[in-house]
Amino acid sequence: MGLDNIVVKGARSHNLKNIDVTIPRDKLVVLTGLSGSGKSSLAFDTIYAEGQRRYVESLSAYARQFLGQMDKPDVDSIEGLSPAISIDQKTTSRNPRSTVGTVTEIFDYLRLLYARIGKPVCPKHGIEISSQTVQQMVDRILSYEERTKLQILAPLVSGRKGTHVKVLEDIKKQGFVRVRIDGEMREVAEEIELDKNKKHTIEVVIDRIVVKEGIETRLADSLETALQLADGRVVVDIIGKEELLFSQHHACPQCGFSIPELEPRMFSFNSPFGACPTCDGLGVKLEVDLELVIPDRSRTLSENAIAPWEPISSQYYPQMLEAVCNHYGIDMDTPVEQLPDHQLEKILYGSGHEKIFFRYENDLGQVRENEILFEGVIPNVKRRYHETSSDYIRDQLEAYMAQKACPTCKGHRLKKEALAVLIGGKHLGEVTKLSIKEAKTFFESLELSKKDFSIARLILKEINDRLGFLMNVGLDYLTLSRSAGTLSGGEAQRIRLATQIGSSLMGVLYILDEPSIGLHQRDNDRLISTLAHMRDLGNTLIVVEHDEDTMLAADYIIDIGPGAGVHGGQVTAAGSPEEIMNDAKSLTGQYLSGKKFIPIPSERRQPNGRSFTVKGASENNLKQVNVEFPLGVFIAVTGVSGSGKSTLINEIVHKALAQKLHRAKDKPGKHKEIVGIEHVDKVIDIDQSPIGRTPRSNPATYTGVFDDIRDVFAMTNEAKVRGYKKGRFSFNVKGGRCEACRGDGIIKIEMHFLPDVYVPCEVCHGKRYNRETLDITYKGKTIADVLDMTVEEALEFFTNIPRIKRKIQTLVDVGLGYIKLGQPATTLSGGEAQRVKLASQLHKRATGKTLYILDEPTTGLHVDDIDRLLKVLQRIVDNGDTVLVIEHNLDVIKTVDHIIDLGPEGGDKGGTIVAQGTPEEVVEVEGSYTGKYLRPILERDRKRMDSRIREHELQRS
């Protein structure tokens, strides 16, 4: 039994209720259940942690200190465990040197390919650079037919200015008769005078030969003479036909551009042998950006239009600016956009050699007067950035700088010698700029000589296989040069999935966390067949997933529940998809079988007449699109992966509105303008990033309800008698907190060779507060007891205090009744963090002018959670505000009022508007993939709703 199954006994990690689970081996197993029900606790914190721990335990103590040690999970036993590999969404590298090519190891094979069969070509003259022996040169010349006339020349001067008198004298002394100067034959005996200001080419005629039998020796002697004379170069003029250039060195015979011996490290931008010397292999340089220096050109100089010189701490730069304006007669009360170019030029780039009178008065009234050379705002920011040793100042100045493509390597990251090596007419930089689909076509259609093919056969197989795996997981639109840090969680996970398939391991336990995130329904089938392929290799796959198609394709489903948090942690159902559907206890089964479903709204909202329009959006792959966003409705932006959704919403709409409305520093993506901004007064991005980076942040502090709770404790009679104010009940400041653990409740003990151990503070026993503070009670509970309550318990406890009840009620509304008020932010999942943020917005008053942006809010959510989330989002829209989601989930798309569908494909073939309108209008559009997959869902759910209505009518009658 142990061999066919993984048997978990007594799992108690987090909220798991001492459960026993049997997971079949070598099968595709889906773990599902509500958000917070304990799926990740079972998959990652129990099974993966134990599999990884057992493997690491087998290594030496020395090796263990370099590996992330896993805590021993709280479980009685796990049998039948294999080495475990976790593919989650958190581990994308933020390193700018990490690209799709390096992460998938395709780049390593490309380097090897270029080093072995690449053809060096002079970038200036387009001549192939190769070193040849005299024997090879003779054979090449003798390949011409008999009686071909030719002359052998030694190129002494190639395109250099001067009279070259000495060169000509040397030729005469050595007894040569003819010379070719600038393409014209001359006798050496002539008086030759050259114009010293023009470039000249001088070639000595060594020999004139007619191709015939027995000429080899003479030909070889003449070639050797020419090579000796011209430093290893020779020109063979086939009279009336062509000229051949030969070189004994790895160098261009015309300009001498040379390339060292080709080796893989020469093509690595992470090695000093291959990296571009200007940008050190990053492909970009940080340059001062004029748009960030003057973010709002409608402001005047006296209104601090020049952002880096705002008078925050010192008046030095504002006074200098005033001196420059006085000197050049520049009006400081004219908006910057109306200033003449020559005046703005002086402010931005300096006075050159012209001196300016500068009088500076500091805060103490001391005056300094001087004649100065004014360097200009942009050179000033650049100089201070490079000269400062303060990280704080460097971070401040970086806000006015932007990444620009490196001028030397044009963003290709490699030095010019590496970029001079071509295969199929493309250098390595150009190949990595191709999308994965284009790269696959390029390598499959590559025409190679027999010799090159035999060398490259295995390398090309590896490259093509890996490109194929990436296409199978729906990533054909990515380029190999795409920085890993810019990938979404789902993309990064699918890349690692493709890399794992490339390794072709068997007998491994893979644990995946929602691989379908960010994937359009169209590409889902390819992902599922990839997972099935990994299973068929002989691996066990445990997939934490909510996607209906993946669940139906699984061999075995384990439904964790029945609720979330304290109400979860049990196995409610386990079996094949059919068995789950027929199990009345399984919430997932009810949704899979259609007994439960998310209803379609009976009617779509009409826009309120107001809208804003983005014009000429052209960032990344957007094709100069104009998009109108109606306000007062629920909008979904849809489209296949890589079609430009995130670019349009996150890079342009969010950043441009935040810059205009909240004076944010982030520079928006390329677009002409946004019309109608006056209809929006706030833009709020509710993403899945943590609500805090430390355990001190928790739902109570984030939603602001903790302030009100502390007020309640400060108002108790005992607190008043003791003179305790609200601050006494904060665990972040001295006074009321336990000083032994500084209000953390736990103490970290560092262990070498073992993971760090966290133990409860022995002074306060994890309560965070000192004894005096805990003497104060409200309705019999201390402040520590309140933090330990679940949201549901707190709602009941504070039911008589409206302002607290209102804030806690919003947490219940978004489905977070099970989390504790004081639960550390670091332990919340992405979906939970996002819902805490939503809750904190819900209790604020609606203005009717707020735009909420959510990027894939359904990540990590079960269908039942999505139902609850949609009710909250619809409530926000009912209040008059606008909700804009980027989404692939058809359950969400079917309930919105307005769809903007981008596409038609991903990458270069995307970036246009395919369809827009209500879901009913979009399904009628021929080229819309979203419409194609949405149509059957709308039809299915309409039928379900009709039958539901009929059932109700029958029950009534």
From Swiss-Prot:
Residues 309-587, 607-935 form the ABC transporter domain. GO terms for molecular function: ATP binding; ATP hydrolysis activity; DNA binding; excinuclease ABC activity; zinc ion binding. A zinc finger (C4-type) spans 252-279, 738-764. GO terms for biological process: nucleotide-excision repair; SOS response. Gene3D superfamilies: ABC transporter ATPase domain-like, ABC transporter ATPase like domain, ATP-grasp fold, A domain, P-loop containing nucleotide triphosphate hydrolases. It is found in: Cytoplasm. Keywords: ATP-binding, Cytoplasm, DNA damage, DNA excision, DNA repair, DNA-binding, Excision nuclease, Metal-binding, Nucleotide-binding, Repeat, SOS response, Zinc, Zinc-finger. ATP binds at residues 33-40, 639-646. Coiled coil: none annotated. Pfam families: UvrA_DNA-bind, UvrA_inter. The keyword Repeat applies. GO terms for cellular component: cytoplasm; excinuclease repair complex. Belongs to the ABC transporter superfamily. UvrA family. Forms a heterotetramer with UvrB during the search for lesions. The UvrABC repair system catalyzes the recognition and processing of DNA lesions. UvrA is an ATPase and a DNA-binding protein. A damage recognition complex composed of 2 UvrA and 2 UvrB subunits scans DNA for abnormalities. When the presence of a lesion has been verified by UvrB, the UvrA molecules dissociate. PANTHER family: UVRABC SYSTEM PROTEIN A. This is UvrABC system protein A. It comes from Halalkalibacterium halodurans (strain ATCC BAA-125 / DSM 18197 / FERM 7344 / JCM 9153 / C-125).
